[in-house]
Amino acid sequence: MSTQTEPKLVTQIDFARAGQITPQMKEVAEREHRDPEYIRERVADGRIAIPANIVHIKKGMRAFGVGEGLSTKVNVNLGISGDKADAAEEWKKVKIAEDFGADAIMDLSNSGKTRQFRQQLIDETPLMVGTVPMYDAIGYMEKPLVKLTKDDLLEVVRAHAEDGVDFMTIHCGINKSVIKSFKETGRLMNIVSRGGSLLFGWMEVTGNENPFYEFYDEVLEICHEYDVTISLGDSCRPGCLYDSNDATETAEMIELGKLCKRAWAAGVQVMVEGPGHMALDEIAANMKLQKRLCHNAPFYVLGPLVTDIGVGYDHITAAIGGAISASSGADFLCYVTPAEHLCLPNAQDVLDGLMATKIAAHAADIAKKVPHARDLDDRMGQARRKLDWDAMWKCALDPVTGKKRYEESPAATEGTCTMCGKMCAVRTVNKIFEGTTIDLGMED
């Protein structure tokens, strides 16, 4: 009789490979109108991730699936900044994210009581919570960047895992080989990833390999213990159109593909992060290349922004790219606000960025034929045909703004709006089919 104990099942991928459907898989299946076995199979082979830290599950989080055949998810970035440390303002942003349909919140706090804010966020929000431990490392360890050790960085990763973070962006792919390519490529915008630039600086000063790459197995051990999904950060994403699809971006993507396989072998769920800035005609091919190189792992992208000159309107430039990227294979969109490249976004910026990204994600889901993606659109068409404004608000992605604008400009003719008033095409045709006389030159 064998005395060898069976390995402990901890992560969603562990259970999926053992043929077990978890409550989280069932929840995702119900929300996505999929069979639970469809979800289990794709979690098992890494095509779907369910970022759900075991600590956060106990606090009542909702389960969200990211990946193949599922609706495109949307993330909101927020957090306390050193130049504008206002926790109350950040909590307003959390409320907006929850009320207006975000699926995830990334806490990018890098100043002040970061752990207190993070813990309270995880206690209170049912959404997925992500972080970037590298942002927190300097303040958490109370050391200058170049004095941080491998053990310091792993301690920060563990602290975030213990707090209940569901997914962590960790820049594991920027190793010495990728840096060599970066230096030889001659980029216009160099490295625009904040976490990636910090690691590049640390590596240049110390002469050491990226500790997240060199000690990747130890990172995976922590992630497995708490079922943290590792979101492999793309340090060398293009920060302008000129740099898109260059050798450096591709070199790092190849490394990220290798790291995907190592994570899956360790029973850790994975997502891979992508661009960035990219011309419209390059996006679809880039999505397909990433899926190929990273073995169909869920792809999490920032836009991409399709022009570099939309300053003040980058929620629009990113939404255009986001619709293309998500319809071409990306699974998760990080929102971009009108404040991008300019300042810390305020609450209105967050709403504008979230809605632009939600629209992009929804448009992509219709194109991808995600089950029931078009249901609300069809219901909206029916409501508009009937001029049923209350029904329209129930279909709208942002019913608050729509209703507010409508009521601010009341029409003289009941059931219409001030754009057309009595000449409303829908009203006219309805009256014809109802057998009502139409005479736009006189009162009805």
PLM regions: where:
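Basic/polar N-terminal segments that are highly enriched at the extreme N-terminus
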Residues: 1-10, 442-444
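Alpha/beta enzyme core
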Residues: 3, 11-309, 313, 319-332
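Hydrophobic alpha-helical segments with strong N-terminal bias
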Residues: 3-6, 313, 349, 405
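Catalytic or ion-coupling anion/metal-binding cores of large enzyme and transporter domains
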Residues: 180-207, 238, 242-244, 344-444
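C-terminal catalytic subdomain
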Residues: 309-318, 324-370
